Curated annotation (Swiss-Prot):
PANTHER family: 3-HYDROXY-5-PHOSPHONOOXYPENTANE-2,4-DIONE THIOLASE, FRUCTOSE-BISPHOSPHATE ALDOLASE CLASS 1. This is 2-amino-4,5-dihydroxy-6-oxo-7-(phosphonooxy)heptanoate synthase. CDD domains: DhnA. Homodecamer. GO terms for biological process: amino acid biosynthetic process; aromatic amino acid family biosynthetic process. 2-amino-4,5-dihydroxy-6-one-heptanoic acid-7-phosphate can be converted to 5-acetyl-1H-pyrrole-2-carboxylic acid (5,2-APC) by a non-enzymatic reaction. It comes from the Bacteria. It comes from Streptomyces griseus. Optimum pH is 6.5-10.0. Catalyzes aldol condensation between L-aspartate-4-semialdehyde (ASA) and dihydroxyacetone phosphate (DHAP), to form 2-amino-4,5-dihydroxy-6-oxo-7-(phosphonooxy)heptanoate.
């Protein structure tokens, strides 16, 4: 937890960690605005209930979706309201816009909010300004902020370049994020350098759908060995043949992993173990 966070913000951060004070398993269900209806979208409420019952720490949703979800599920997991949006049909899908506010999210019962920034995109300046404004509102209301940071734009050749990912994490930290979601760079040692340098927890993205379950679990294990605090994995959970079973396997790996000692380890130590 942030050492200088006010009581209310610290309390909300602790509530996010339902099963472990150091690790997080988040399932974003915010893809539908960007890509269209989710798989099983007509069953959003039971899907959220299934995830909440299988050791997921937090679920990311857009504000309108909450009208169609039983609040009971969020006595078992945390609600993260996503404030950013764009669609794949836009002239620039990387241009994210704010579609909600911290205050509105609080009225809906949010435990935290999230914003999306595409570092290097043509709309970067607006997204950074939006995140700064959201961070100020989070300070005013003592609400945890999850920053989803992606190197993504016309000058970005390799979005997993460790220097770019480190820069994205630093932008989030400097603007006031409590948690950062970003890309796994593909190397345990390189990821360990990024996570060790970050004063806030870093969770890695789940990425595109992969039908190979063992490959998904190996990816998460590598990220944890690289010091990640956990994952924010959507499609590889909610598009799995059995989302609850997949959530259980990921939760067990994240919360009961033998790599726990490597989490947020000094970069040199992690590199030696890689």
């Amino acid at each position: 937890m942030a050492p200088n966070a006010p009581f209310a913000r610290s309390l909300r951060l602790q509530r996010l960690h339902h099963h472990d004070p150091d690790r997080l398993f988040i399932v974003p269900l915010d893809h539908s605005i960007t890509d269209g209806p989710l798989s099983r979208a007509h069953r959003l409420d039971p899907l959220v209930g299934e995830l909440a019952s299988h050791h997921v720490d937090g679920i990311v949703l857009h504000k309108g979706s909450l009208r169609h979800v039983d609040p009971e599920w969020f006595t078992r997991t945390s609600l993260i309201v996503h404030l950013s949006a764009s669609t794949v049909h836009a002239p620039d899908p990387n241009a994210k816009y704010l579609v909600s506010s911290v205050e509105e999210s609080l009225r809906m019962g949010a435990d935290a909010v999230s914003v999306h920034v595409n570092l290097g995109s043509e709309g970067e300046r607006h997204q950074i300004a939006d995140m700064a404004a959201v961070a100020e509102a989070c300070d005013r209301w003592n609400v945890p902020l999850l920053a989803m940071m992606y190197p993504r734009g016309p000058k970005i050749d390799d979005p997993r370049d460790p220097a770019l990912v480190a820069h994205a994490v630093q932008v989030a930290v400097d603007l006031g994020a409590d948690l950062v979601k970003t890309l796994y760079v593909g190397s345990v040692a390189a990821m360990a350098e990024i996570t060790a340098a970050s004063p806030v927890p870093v969770v890695v993205v789940g990425g595109p759908r992969d039908s190979d379950e063992s490959r998904i679990l190996a990816y998460v294990d590598d990220a944890l060995r690289g010091g990640a605090a956990g994952v924010a994995m959507g499609r590889n959970v909610f598009q799995a043949p059995d989302p609850g079973a997949m959530a259980d396997k990921l939760s067990d790996l994240i919360h009961n992993s033998g790599t726990r000692g490597a989490a947020r380890a000094p970069a040199g130590a992690a590199a030696g173990a890689a």
